Amino acid sequence: MNKISRKGFLKIAAAAAMSGVTAGALAACESASSAASSAVSSGAGSVAAGATYIPGTYEGTAQGISSTVKVTMTFSETAVTDVVVDTSGETASYGAAAADELRQQLLEAGSAEIDGVSGSTITSDAVMKAAQSCYAQAKGEAVVTSVQLPSGDENDWLGTEPDIDEAAITETWDTDIVIVGAGNGGMCAAAYAAQKGLNFRIIEQNSAVMETRHWYGTIDSSEAQKQGVPPVDRAELLSEISRSMGGRCDQRVVKTWIDESAAMHDFVAGILESAPYNYTCNLTLGDEAKWPDDTQISQTKLMFPVQQVDYSSAEKPRNVVFQEYIESLGYAVDFHTGLAKLEKDGDGRITGLIAQNTEDGHFIRINASQGVLLACGGYAGNPYMMEKLDPLGTSVTTACSYAPADKGYGIRAAIWAGAHLDAEAAPVLFDRGLVAPGVDSGYVESASSFGGKAFPGTVGQYNPGSQPFLKVNRHGERFMNESQEYDNASHASFQQPGHVYAMIHDANFREDVDRFHTIGCSALTRYIPGMMESQLEQYEAEGLIMKADTIEELADKMGFAGADKDTFIATVQRYNELYDAQKDEDFGKPASRLSAIRTAPFYGCWLGASLLCSLQGISITPNCQAKDDRNEPIPGLYVTGDMSGSFFQNNYPCVMGGTACGRTLTFAIKAIKQMAGLE
């Protein structure tokens, strides 16, 4: 048992005080501590008369969204003379890319209070906390260090529930409902609870609401009816989802989404489409919800129900709107407040939780008379859990597009309290993990990343990777029908060297993409003008896209040599023959998805999977109540979002756009209704 006591904190503080450091905050619900720690590289003593700082170089660290952020600052007696910001372990296109701007802001500000970088709020906050540590050291002041909740390790991803001494709990909140996590599920639940005037608190360990997933699936929504869309065959939809899950789902749980998602949309629309927002709903329908006819003839029939709606063109994302909405009704998100452990009574009922303020470290008991809703996300950002729970998904992944804060703490806390985790992994993999030649799938060492590991790709998602161009392995061999669901290509690559494959096309890619007419998010390559063209240019400059005037030259640039090069050239020739015949005799790809490779310049790239999220979660009832190992409901504990189970198994049916987020929002409302006795 991880004992965290008042005495323990005092011991830490006493020991730290000898080196000018005091005890501080813990981590919670999806990431490690956000408090800063420090180490003095040079410089010592006290501030001289007439001086502001003790000259020297000081280092501060703080937990960002996916890694430990480090700031190193050099001081003269009166000013900061140099700053180094290391955010290399953060999200590549956001926090990691913000280092130079954050460095410049620190140099110009003369303090740790800077504006930060838009889109990188959590990374910016971490940089400011690390800089505060440097300033404190340079002034000879005490510096906050961190104590972390159990994060698990490569041998034990679950870890042990912390044992928190009563004396360490210095604050108590009494409420009816506690919502843990201010993401898609948590914010929807909070908005619904606020509209109903319920007594609730919502806590979030980070400093802002989490990223909005704009697209969500609804069945027979009012928007679909307004557009004249025929009703969905619900029995067929249920059967198709169950088939996709190999029968491992709880069909009653799936039916909760099917039957109640329309009402969920009406609730969301009632806020987003009303003043002061007046946003317009977009419904995916018509040709955008349908693959070409020959894909339904040449392949097993797949169902594409008209269900996905979004407000992606709105000025503010949905989670921010929900935050403003609950604030207008007198509620607020308790930021910097993270889950430490759930609490239950002698009968096994969840009575609330213990949280910790991640800024100053004090513990809070939150009593919840009606229940706790966990909406903490999955475990995609936790390599310990990924490697043990989803070895196949981990082994075929080259890049990440997940929320790095999703480290599975909510799942672990639920299991500690007696909840059951679904037996099978369910990663959401996109065939868009762009990497350089010679790079294998799977983790690589990354000292600044959580768990010391990260995926090698620097591009979150290369959207054109989902286009059904020719794809070959490292021996130059074609090995599949490329016209598949997003994760199929990634799973197929598990049987190939390095678990990666190459995608090849020629200069006529624009005509090909239009004819392919892929749907869902892969359609962005088709209907955003110049998107693929600009990405080809950008990633060629970065050494991730190869461009050549001949197939032989392309083979060399892609890394094919010897017999593999000969095979690659022969494969391209064979593929052209199949295109000319308009019949794929090798793998049965529909004719509309074939393409010629004859017009220079020729392009090639290497791909693996891009991991969006994990959907292996806590088993739940149709009322979204967590279940124990005997499949009995746990009183007082409810779950939604990526950490909820009983729905997705093995994979995500990506041809049914928005299903995961639609389920998240629907279950969030369902859980609130159940806890509050509204149904």
Language-model-derived ranges and their functions:
Residues 48-149:
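Active-site- and interface-proximal helix/loop "cap" or "latch" segments in soluble metabolic
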Residues 168-183:
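Beta1/beta-strand and adjacent pyrophosphate-binding region of the FAD-binding site
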Residues 195-212:
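Glycine-rich FAD pyrophosphate-binding loop
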Residues 359-361, 367-439, 655-657, 661-670:
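Glycine-rich loop(s) and the adjacent beta-strand/alpha-helix scaffold that form part
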Residues 411-413, 420-560:
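An anion/pyrophosphate-binding glycine-rich loop and adjacent beta-alpha core
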